[in-house]
Amino acid sequence: MRNSGSSCSESVGPPLWLLAELTYRCPLQCPYCSNPLEFAREGAELSTAEWIEVFRQARELGAAQLGFSGGEPLLRQDLAELIEAGRGLGFYTNLITSGIGLDEARLARFAEAGLDHVQISFQAADEEVNNLLAGSRKAFAQKLAMARAVKAHGYPMVLNFVTHRHNIDNIERIIQLCIELEADYVELATCQFYGWAALNRAGLLPTRAQLERAERITAEYRQRLAAEGNPCKLIFVTPDYYEERPKACMGGWASVFLDITPDGTALPCHSARQLPVQFPNVREHSLRHIWYESFGFNRYRGDAWMPEPCRSCEEKERDHGGCRCQAFLLTGDADATDPVCAKSARHDLILAARRQAEEAPLGLDALTWRNQRASRLICKA
């Protein structure tokens, strides 16, 4: 891509957090995956040397944290080499994984390479539900074993549970499992509706009552853990669909976060690829050009792009106009006011989604599972 935007390098700070989406390959088929629906048409993955060059350039720009994700990053056989390269450049390194494909030997190798942090995701605290959502009969047992192994290797125990209408009522058991595993940090993250989660929203969005109950139970456990002197930290993330003001996505468009997809496409957030905006590729441009000069990264910086009521809103410095990806998904217009905002002319779309969660939700059997076959069908359509 040739740059068609204008430079705003004088007012833009450096990227601080680099996310390396090493691959879209994954042994699981979670129906709420944030990967693009059309991942089956993804081009060739960056090579080891290409990834290391990305790390070098990002570090030169000022990035300090390097996350390895996917898909499932463990499917990259060069992962230890990439960790070692990132750590050698001075990054704080973080592995975001399902734990499927991890074993004691690889964990020891990652420790030798300098990995700082491991986050393991669970689909549920119930083995049957976890395995159903993961699409693997062995997933739950493997995750438990690897969570314990991560703790034994001296890493902070960081667990992530994506919650939705089919598992959120078991929030107490989820928290109890985290305590049993001696987790240091637990992210109880209700589905954010992008990628496959957006496709399956009618079967995943909890009701307001479900959310309020889960949040209350989480708060009770926080108090109990604090009283017992237990260091476990519980982080509860609500979906935008029950808010009246939008989030400041990633702290503002292309202000802190830089995502590189498996084929080298650079994005200002995980979901931006779905937008009608052309984004640059690291195989064609330097990260410096991409971050400071490219049209895609400058498209929604600042507030000149904002329509009313955002442009004259006193809250625009706080939420930066909300999420561009969410606006596009719901309205078909990436420039539109985020419908989550009660001031939006399309807030009715959010109200309709809430009503659907109450009146006509879909069951687990109606979900579209994230896998190659489903992605190929979507690509054909």
Curated annotation (Swiss-Prot):
Top-level division of the source organism's lineage: Bacteria
This protein's UniProt keywords: 4Fe-4S, Iron, Iron-sulfur, Metal-binding, Oxidoreductase, PQQ biosynthesis, S-adenosyl-L-methionine
Cofactor(s) the record lists: [4Fe-4S] cluster
Gene3D superfamilies: Aldolase class I
Enzyme class, broadest EC rank: oxidoreductase
Enzyme Commission identifier(s): 1.21.98.4
PROSITE patterns (UniProt xref): MOAA_NIFB_PQQE, RADICAL_SAM
Keyword 4Fe-4S: yes
GO biological process, one term: pyrroloquinoline quinone biosynthetic process
Reaction equation(s) it catalyzes: [PQQ precursor protein] + S-adenosyl-L-methionine = E-Y cross-linked-[PQQ precursor protein] + 5'-deoxyadenosine + L-methionine + H(+)
GO MF assignments: 4 iron, 4 sulfur cluster binding; cyclase activity; iron ion binding; oxidoreductase activity; S-adenosyl-L-methionine binding
UniProt: [4Fe-4S] cluster binding residues: 26, 30, 33
Keyword Transport included in the entry's annotation: no
Pathways involved: Cofactor biosynthesis; pyrroloquinoline quinone biosynthesis
InterPro entries linked to this entry: 4Fe4S-binding_SPASM_dom (IPR023885), Aldolase_TIM (IPR013785), Elp3/MiaA/NifB-like_rSAM (IPR006638), MoaA_NifB_PqqE_Fe-S-bd_CS (IPR000385), PQQ_synth_PqqE_bac (IPR011843), PqqE-like (IPR017200), Radical_SAM_PqqE_MftC-like (IPR050377), rSAM (IPR007197)
Details of cofactor binding: Binds 1 [4Fe-4S] cluster. The cluster is coordinated with 3 cysteines and an exchangeable S-adenosyl-L-methionine.
Domain Radical SAM core intervals: 12-228
NCBIfam families in UniProt: PQQ_syn_pqqE (TIGR02109), rSAM_more_4Fe4S (TIGR04085)
Subunit structure, interactors included: Interacts with PqqD. The interaction is necessary for activity of PqqE.
Function comment: Catalyzes the cross-linking of a glutamate residue and a tyrosine residue in the PqqA protein as part of the biosynthesis of pyrroloquinoline quinone (PQQ).
Family named by the database record: Belongs to the radical SAM superfamily. PqqE family.
Designated name of the protein: PqqA peptide cyclase
